[in-house]
From Swiss-Prot:
<dbReference type="InterPro" id="IPR026249">
    <property type="entry name" value="CASTOR_fam"/>
</dbReference>
<dbReference type="InterPro" id="IPR045865">
    <property type="entry name" value="ACT-like_dom_sf"/>
</dbReference>
<dbReference type="InterPro" id="IPR049479">
    <property type="entry name" value="CASTOR1_ACT-like"/>
</dbReference>
<dbReference type="InterPro" id="IPR027795">
    <property type="entry name" value="CASTOR_ACT_dom"/>
</dbReference>
<dbReference type="Pfam" id="PF18700">
    <property type="entry name" value="Castor1_N"/>
</dbReference>
<comment type="similarity">
    <text>Belongs to the GATS family.</text>
</comment>
<dbReference type="Pfam" id="PF21389">
    <property type="entry name" value="CASTOR1_ACT-like"/>
</dbReference>
<dbReference type="GO" id="GO:0061700">
    <property type="term" value="C:GATOR2 complex"/>
</dbReference>
<feature type="domain" description="ACT 2">
    <location>
        <begin position="262"/>
        <end position="322"/>
    </location>
</feature>
<comment type="subunit">
    <text>Forms homodimers and heterodimers with CASTOR1. Interacts with the GATOR2 complex which is composed of MIOS, SEC13, SEH1L, WDR24 and WDR59; the interaction is not regulated by arginine.</text>
</comment>
<keyword id="KW-0963">Cytoplasm</keyword>
<dbReference type="GO" id="GO:0005829">
    <property type="term" value="C:cytosol"/>
</dbReference>
<dbReference type="InterPro" id="IPR051719">
    <property type="entry name" value="CASTOR_mTORC1"/>
</dbReference>
<protein>
    <recommendedName>
        <fullName>Cytosolic arginine sensor for mTORC1 subunit 2</fullName>
    </recommendedName>
</protein>
<dbReference type="Pfam" id="PF13840">
    <property type="entry name" value="ACT_7"/>
</dbReference>
<feature type="domain" description="ACT 1">
    <location>
        <begin position="72"/>
        <end position="140"/>
    </location>
</feature>
<dbReference type="GO" id="GO:1904262">
    <property type="term" value="P:negative regulation of TORC1 signaling"/>
</dbReference>
Length: 329
């Protein structure tokens, strides 16, 4: 297995819902007019609380500096696990549960905080740039570590060090944050960038102007329904995470879906905003899923974390996580 350190230097930011009009000029450019910007990594996720933006340095320049833009105090690097060589775009997604033991748990054991972004194509593990020497040292026994430089994949220079580095004891990691599962059913999909103009106005509506208005056809007493939509444009590949009601607004022939048409249910992690310093949150969730061999997507946002699991597994997942939660008492 190879671990690729991508060349994007990323910022993670949050915009309050009511402040999004201040940023739509830049966000529309990043999402729909990529030829007009040098940005290669852009992700926008709307939750009930806010919009989370993950963007590279070039894309960050498209956003106005504003007191309404909260930015995490670090530059982040994206790591990508690739099986059998190639890049994320040409390989099959491995899934967050498959890297739980090899990547997520070892980093948690070393108190290295991670920020996850699963897309239709792959899973990105974001780590603080300043933590990279610890990351490479922790994972060098499991992976061939390669770095992308000017688009070429080269052997990573040995950033490792052993001074003060203690082999951790494997620890039990009970789930310590409150969990909830909205009633929405989600799909994870993509579309050909060439067809983006055909759905651009619809996407703009969904991203900025729908204001969480529920589909009138949806049950009006559905109080467990939340607003969640994620759009990523990374190295020319589009990924979309949306609920079924939103999906039904799109021409079906334009969206890629799995042959099984699989739908996903969400587990939201966190009662209070989680912050960026606590380690092991992703591991607490992904390790029980890995043990049960349940595939998952995982999307961290500025305030909360979100795991998506196959619809038919949701009750078992909630049970397994609740058992883990009980273990903390």
């Amino acid at each position: 297995m190879e671990l690729h350190i991508l060349e994007h230097r990323l910022q993670v930011a949050s915009v309050a819902k009511e402040s999004i009009p201040l940023f739509t000029y830049g966000l529309i450019k990043l999402a729909f007019l990529s030829s007009k910007t040098r940005c290669k990594f852009f992700s926008l996720t709307e939750t009930p609380e806010d919009y989370t933006i993950i963007v590279d340095e070039e894309g960050f320049l498209e956003l106005p500096s504003s007191e309404h833009l909260s930015v995490a105090d670090a530059t982040w690097l994206a790591l990508n696990v690739v099986s059998g060589g190639g890049s994320f775009s040409s390989s099959q997604p491995i899934g967050v549960t498959k890297i739980a033991k090899s990547v997520i748990a070892p980093l948690a054991d070393q108190n290295i905080s991670v920020f996850m972004l699963s897309t239709y194509q792959t899973d990105f593990i974001l780590v603080r740039e300043r933590d990279l020497p610890f990351v490479t040292h922790t994972l060098s026994s499991e992976f061939t570590i390669l770095r992308v430089v000017n688009g070429e994949t080269v052997a990573a220079e040995n950033l490792s060090f052993t001074n003060g580095f203690v082999k951790p004891k494997m620890v039990q990691r009970p789930v310590i944050h409150p969990l909830s599962s909205p009633s929405n059913r989600f799909c994870v999909t993509s579309l050909d960038p060439d067809t983006l103009p055909a759905v651009a106005t619809l996407l703009m509506d969904v991203m900025f102007y729908s204001n969480g208005v529920k589909d009138p056809m949806a049950a009006s007493d559905d109080c467990g329904h939340i607003r969640f939509f994620s759009f990523s444009l990374i190295e020319g590949y589009i990924s979309l995470v949306m609920d079924v009601q939103t999906q039904q607004r799109f021409p079906s022939h334009l969206l890629f879906t799995s042959a099984s048409g699989e739908l996903w249910k969400m587990v939201r992690i966190g009662g209070q905003p989680l912050g960026f310093d606590e380690c092991g949150i992703v591991a607490q969730i992904s390790e029980p899923l890995a043990a049960a061999d349940i595939p998952a997507y995982y999307i961290s946002t500025f305030k909360f974390d979100h795991a998506l699991v196959p619809e038919e597994n949701i009750s078992g997942v909630i049970h397994a996580l609740k058992v883990s939660q009980a273990g903390k008492h």
